[in-house]
UniProtKB/Swiss-Prot annotation:
Residue intervals passing through the bilayer: 8-28
Organism annotation: Bradyrhizobium diazoefficiens (strain JCM 10833 / BCRC 13528 / IAM 13628 / NBRC 14792 / USDA 110)
Cellular localisation: Membrane
One Pfam short name: MlaD
Highest taxon of the lineage: Bacteria
Keywords: Membrane, Transmembrane, Transmembrane helix
Protein name per its UniProtKB record: Uncharacterized protein bll6063
Chief localization: membrane
UniProt key word Glycosyltransferase: no
A GO cellular-component term linked to this record: membrane
InterPro entries xrefs: ABC_trans_aux (IPR005586), Mce/MlaD (IPR003399)
Membrane topology, from the record: Single-pass membrane protein
Amino acid sequence: METRAPYVLIGTFVLAAILAVFGFIYWLNNTGGIGPRTNYHVQFQGPVPGLLVGAGVLFNGIRVGEVAQLGLAPDNPRFVNATISVASATPVRADTRVGLDFQGLTGVPVVTLEGGMIVAKSGEPLTLIAEAGAGQSMTQAARDALRRVDSVLEDNSGPLKDTIANFKTFSDGLARNTGKLDGILAGLEKMTGGGAPAQKITYDLRTPQNLGPAAKTLSASLAIPEPTAVAMLQTQRMLFAPVGDNPGFADFLWADSIPKLVQARLIDSFENYDIAHAPLRTSDLGQADYQLLIDIRRFRIATDGETRVEIGLSARIVDKNGKVVASRLVETSEKLDKVEPAAAVAAFDAAFARIAKELIGWTVLAV
């Protein structure tokens, strides 16, 4: 008898512990369990898929109770009556909104309560009416939406077929007239100023060839650096005086900026005069005995009075020590019968040929 006593005590302790654990779990599941509770009747006007006795009741997202009872309405089997038991401190009102929510990945249903301002009359049992479609899950909502779409498509199958046929006819017409459409679009781009920009046309200044026999050659080395000029002359565009709109020259470009072009053609002219004693560029190797410094004063088309091209240069010959040996102005003009790029370039060629011939003769005498 004495041997069995410890086993009885141990068994009693184990049973008590098991009961305590179950009681604790029940208390947790019922939000404290022993607190005062209030029951409310809830009526759902449709199915409540998955809702079970013991399911949670949430007020503004906070668990306040559970579903105590479920059943069908005796007067209308489509309705579902439920009894919820919530903590008495929960501010349930006569206009509190009731719904059904599905939580988690598995979609566990819970009863949801939200808001409410109207206080129910004392003594009257409070019945809450759930919102229409409160028990509708996302799957059911999607199924109903697809069913409605299918119904709409079925009712309008004829017009839809006609619309698709019209699209096909329109598409075939576009395919047959692709070339014409490209032309129309190109015309619209031109009309609206769009499309690719116009291609610029480059013009060169011709080097004079017939400079006569070299009666006198350069007796010392000569360099011709890039001429100086004001900013307006540092351009490849055709210049006009006075400045105006000349649409015929919108796409006109000299082969290089005016100072570099004048330098290159002057050196070419000296080479054509006497290749054996041709001048150097300042970037060439070695230091020349003299430099021919050019400042461009005019290189333009003048439209005041008789239309003409004008070239004006100031020239100075400087020795190694920076001393000016000789200087002079060289200016000329050429009548321009027609203000267009080809005629203008021909006039510049003629004027530059006179400038180059005069500079060469003056330079070989001064050096």
